[in-house]
Amino acid sequence: MFVSILIPLYNGVEFLKEAITSIRNQTYQQWEVIIGINGHPKNSDTYFQAKLYENHKIRIIEYDTKGKPKTLNKMVEDASYDIICLLDVDDKWLSTKLEKQISLKSKYDVIGTACQYFGTRNDIPKIPLGEVDTRYIFRVNPIINSSCMINKKDSFWNDEFIEDYDMWFRLVFEKKTFYNVPEVLTLHRIHPASHFNNSNHNFLPNLINKWKKKFGV
């Protein structure tokens, strides 16, 4: 099974080498990478640096979409394969990440991994490990974004709310199955400009209320 790995790129090109290196070091090598450049012209330093990595397995595509969710949805359309992984440009994977997820793909629709922060923090976020009891989705976002492996047909990010959490709610509603490999295989960088510090958590109550109404709880 081949995997399409999506790296949306707006800021953080200085971290791209580490992300790409962590993909190249995977024990599972049946993959392609799409680096989706958004908001940078062809004469920009970001575009030039990304082009340095282009080869038969790594594609560079420009998008004129506004915002990460719309860019990701376009990247999914351009993906060659039926399995999608997401890697934020400032994050990276341990070498057996894809191999261990692929071994579970026939059993589960959404597969994540345990994660560790690095950079300005080094703790391990608390998420459900092993087979995820999706009843707990109202308490915690069950999948770390950069750890996810998901079917292409299920991949759609909504820019109205917190994009990944909203998608997990939708897939739980559709009775999809979730699993987190109980091993730290994803490293999530925390730094002043990271999504961790800048995501709009004010949307969270509205998101929870939206899905409580749909679930009838």
Each language-model region and where it sits:
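Cell-envelope/extracellular polymer assembly enzymes that use nucleotide-activated donors
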Residues: 2-4, 22, 32, 166
